[in-house]
Amino acid sequence: MAEASEFNFNLRRKSRAVTASRRVKEEVKEKQKMDDSKSQVVDVDSVSVYSHESSRSNYSDAYEKLKREPVVEESNDARYRTFEFSEDEETFKPANKMSDKSQRNSKSKHTEGLECSDTVLEKISELTLEIEKVKQMNQPITVDAAFNMTLRNVDNLTTRQKQALVNSIINSMN
């Protein structure tokens, strides 16, 4: 109902005056139904002056009027967003509205920011791919290649690591 201020409620006032003059009539009908236990049932039906058909047509007419109204580009929400509430005066003041040019500039800056982040993400993915390639190149392909690489790098191992390496080689031969 944020956009309720756009509607004309004069029709509703007229219908209130008409309905105030008319009274709702109530008819009580007693129906007797015979059940297996042969009990009596009393039904109360309330019937209004208006028929069901006419109330439907009123709604359909109102709906058609709403459909014929021109489409408003700017809703009430967008209109009232340009006002700021002043606490000291308890009123609404018009806010500084950005011009179309500044809005376009801010949108273009936003898209440039997205493009920059896209390029950064692309570079990061390329570098990650290169790191994976280097890791694969350093990984031994076969057991013999791993053995030869280990022997080449024996000088970098500590004494305990060398002892563990010799023990593992001896155990693998058994």
From Swiss-Prot:
Principal location: host cell
Entry GO MF terms: ATP hydrolysis activity; magnesium ion binding; nucleotide binding; RNA binding
Transmembrane segments: none
Cellular component terms (Gene Ontology): host cell cytoplasm
PTM section of the record: O-glycosylated.
UniProt keyword Nucleotide-binding, yes or no: yes
InterPro entries associated with the record: Rotavirus_A/C_NSP5, Rotavirus_B_NSP5
Disordered: region residues: 18-40, 86-114
Pfam families with a match to the protein in the record: GBR_NSP5
GO biological process, one term: viral genome replication
Alphabetized UniProt keyword annotations: Glycoprotein, Host cytoplasm, Nucleotide-binding, RNA-binding
Record's subunit section: Homodimer. Interacts with VP1. Interacts with VP2. Interacts with NSP2 and NSP6.
Homology family: Belongs to the rotavirus NSP5 family.
Function as written in the Swiss-Prot or TrEMBL entry: Plays an essential role in the viral genome replication. Participates, together with NSP2, in the formation of viral factories (viroplasms) which are large inclusions in the host cytoplasm where replication intermediates are assembled and viral RNA replication takes place. Orchestrates the recruitment of viroplasmic proteins such as capsid proteins to these factories.
Protein known as: Non-structural protein 5
Biological source species: Rotavirus B (isolate RVB/Rat/United States/IDIR/1984/G1P[X]) (RV-B)
